Amino acid sequence: MSNSTSTPNTGLSYKDAGVDIEAGDALVDRIKSVAKRTTRPEVMGGLGGFGALCKIPKGYEEPVLVSGTDGVGTKLRLALNLNRHDTIGQDLVAMCVNDLLVCGAEPLFFLDYYATGHLNVDVAANVVTGIGKGCELAGCALVGGETAEMPGMYEGEDYDLAGFAVGVVEQSKIIDGSKVKAGDVLIGVASSGAHSNGYSLLRKILDVKNVDLTQEIDGRSLADAAMEPTRIYVKPVLELCKQVDVHAMAHITGGGLPGNLPRVLPNGAQAVIDEASWEWPELFKLLQREGGVEQFEMYRTFNCGVGMVIAVDAADADKTIQVLNAQGEKSWKIGHIQDNAESIEGADEKIRVIFA
């Protein structure tokens, strides 16, 4: 005869293992409206499919697809420490689409990867809202992503981000640096702050020197200045490309001016940067002062106030500045290109880019 006494159900569930499927579903429901605001006419279908479909925009004769992926580095650690999650998504989009822009590409769509130890729906929704804002600023569609709850891989609600962007450019209009020549003028376009690079050093300085994040610089707190989202240059620069023959562009990210300008210079070309042409924003002055950081170390770690550099013919320099400034981008002549027989491919960054 069987024992009729009921026993509690001791079977384990996915939730017991630390993965909350309902939380993931709740997040998807909350971000559908965000994705909808970013849609483009070329996008076929909405969120939720196994793959996102997108047509090539009309008007291209020989379209070339351009792809890129990036993250936001340890700026994410600062965001977690400050409990500020509303702008880090914009940083993620900016890092990807500004890279596509360098070759003249129009961003089409964006996908994100969000990995965490324990999914906090409110935090994740804030992050994705920032991603949506970034996509709107860049004119690209948020077509999907992946949210991975991985207990044991990340501490608590800590999370990591990665972004993936795809754009398109007319083959005959690809900007690859091949037109760069001696005498070209370099136009600097202002950054909004440290963008998303150099934050390991930035955080080290703040920590070692016990810097007060509430102190005011440039009319706002240091915390606000450090978390200012990366500027998205897509729309102003694409407009510039319609009006001016752009020879090359460099997105000033990790490696700063000396690390990124050589990536778009032809062999034998040397960039001469006029240090007196701009004043560093207060954030970088503070970091150099508090950390005792050498000048060249600053230049190869931070953008130092320059988020993008554009090379144009000297005859187009003034028009380039005029077009960019008219669209709200602060820009100026930052230097020029000269020939240098010693500047061979793969040469030391101090040779390829000199500061005068």
Curated annotation (Swiss-Prot):
Query: Species name for this entry?
Result: Acinetobacter baylyi (strain ATCC 33305 / BD413 / ADP1)
Q: Which gene encodes it?
A: purM
List the InterPro entries hit by this protein, alphabetically: PurM-like_C_dom, PurM-like_C_sf, PurM-like_N, PurM-like_N_sf, PurM_cligase
UniProt enzyme class: ligase
Pfam families for the chain: AIRS (PF00586), AIRS_C (PF02769)
Any GO BP annotation: adenine biosynthetic process
Report keywords, A-Z. ATP-binding, Cytoplasm, Ligase, Nucleotide-binding, Purine biosynthesis
Q: Where in the cell is it found?
A: Cytoplasm
- Where this protein primarily resides, as one coarse class? cytoplasm
Q: Which domain of life is it from?
A: Bacteria
The reaction(s) this protein catalyses: 2-formamido-N(1)-(5-O-phospho-beta-D-ribosyl)acetamidine + ATP = 5-amino-1-(5-phospho-beta-D-ribosyl)imidazole + ADP + phosphate + H(+)
The family annotation for this protein states:
Belongs to the AIR synthase family.
Q: Which GO terms describe its cellular component?
A: cytosol
Q: What is this protein called?
A: Phosphoribosylformylglycinamidine cyclo-ligase
